[in-house]
């Protein structure tokens, strides 16, 4: 039951402590973000003796210069698969945030033998053959496509400030997040997720709802998961969408607990 790289940052700790069960965490960021956004949680988990890798996917963050028409969901899935294989990781706790949930789904389909459990953190999820725009509300899709047209370029969805992150403008890390956001590759939202196995590929899966405030854009996803995947674990966390920024210690506690239970 389921209860950043290239300057892509690879964070690890070799001085592991005491009785703590040392876990391998791979943290996959969401749209407009990069591996950098996990820094507060990376620091928490490394401080507790775990190994943590938070890659930045192609076309985003410090890899935004690699944005191209071919920067698709499949490319981002390959980014994470290649990190796990290059680091020769096994027994991985794979965490996908927001758009990163689509990526984590593809990774689990391709290399399940390297994974212990999947954690979908306020994730965007679809069924095989669907793309991200297929499950989002039509008003959201229209708004995002209008922003692409207004930007005068066709490869990426422009940054829209902190909208959707749940981060208040007066939060101590608001400026840090805002200045590091980068346009998000449009093709990642129009590329269908093609799976050879059922979503989750038989691995223990947990969906974590960031409930305060709840990100209404993902309401259709949450409804689908609760109705179609009753065997998955379900957790709520008392913070907003960018939980790794808003409540890193609380999120680290939850990830440790889910890792220990799997």
Describe each model-derived feature in a short phrase:
Residues 180-198:
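Active-site nucleophile elbow and catalytic-triad environment of alpha/beta-hydrolase enzymes
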Residues 109, 115, 119-158, 188-189, ...:
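Flexible "cap/lid" loop of the alpha/beta hydrolase fold
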Residues 51, 57-93, 109-110, 133-137:
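Active-site loop/oxyanion-hole signature of alpha/beta-hydrolase fold enzymes
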Residues 207-209:
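Short beta-strand/loop motif that positions the catalytic acidic residue
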Residues 23-64:
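Conserved HGGG/HGGXW glycine-rich cap/lid loop of the alpha/beta-hydrolase fold
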């Amino acid at each position: 039951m389921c209860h950043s790289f290239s300057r892509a940052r690879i964070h690890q700790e070799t001085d592991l402590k005491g009785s703590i069960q040392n876990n391998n965490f791979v943290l996959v960021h969401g749209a407009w973000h990069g591996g950098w956004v996990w820094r507060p949680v990376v620091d928490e988990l490394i401080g507790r003796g775990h190994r943590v890798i938070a890659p930045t996917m192609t076309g985003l963050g410090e890899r935004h210069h690699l944005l191209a028409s071919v920067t698709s969901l499949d490319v981002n899935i390959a980014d994470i698969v290649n990190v796990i294989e290059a680091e020769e990781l096994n027994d991985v706790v794979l965490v996908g945030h927001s758009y990163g949930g689509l990526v984590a789904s593809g990774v689990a389909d391709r290399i399940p033998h390297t994974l212990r459990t999947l954690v979908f953190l306020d994730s965007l999820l679809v069924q095989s053959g669907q793309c991200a725009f297929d499950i989002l509300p039509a008003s959201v899709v229209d708004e995002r496509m209008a922003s692409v047209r207004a930007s005068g370029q066709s490869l990426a969805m422009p940054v829209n400030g902190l909208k959707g992150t749940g981060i208040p403008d007066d939060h101590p890390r608001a400026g840090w997040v805002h200045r590091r956001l980068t346009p998000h590759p449009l093709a990642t939202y129009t590329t269908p997720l093609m799976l050879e196995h059922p979503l989750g590929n038989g691995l223990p899966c947990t969906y974590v709802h960031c409930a305060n405030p709840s990100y209404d854009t993902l309401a259709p996803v949450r409804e689908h998961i609760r109705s179609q995947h009753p065997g998955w674990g379900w957790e709520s966390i008392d913070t907003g969408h960018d939980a790794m920024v808003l409540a890193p210690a609380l999120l680290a506690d939850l990830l440790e607990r889910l890792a220990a239970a799997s």
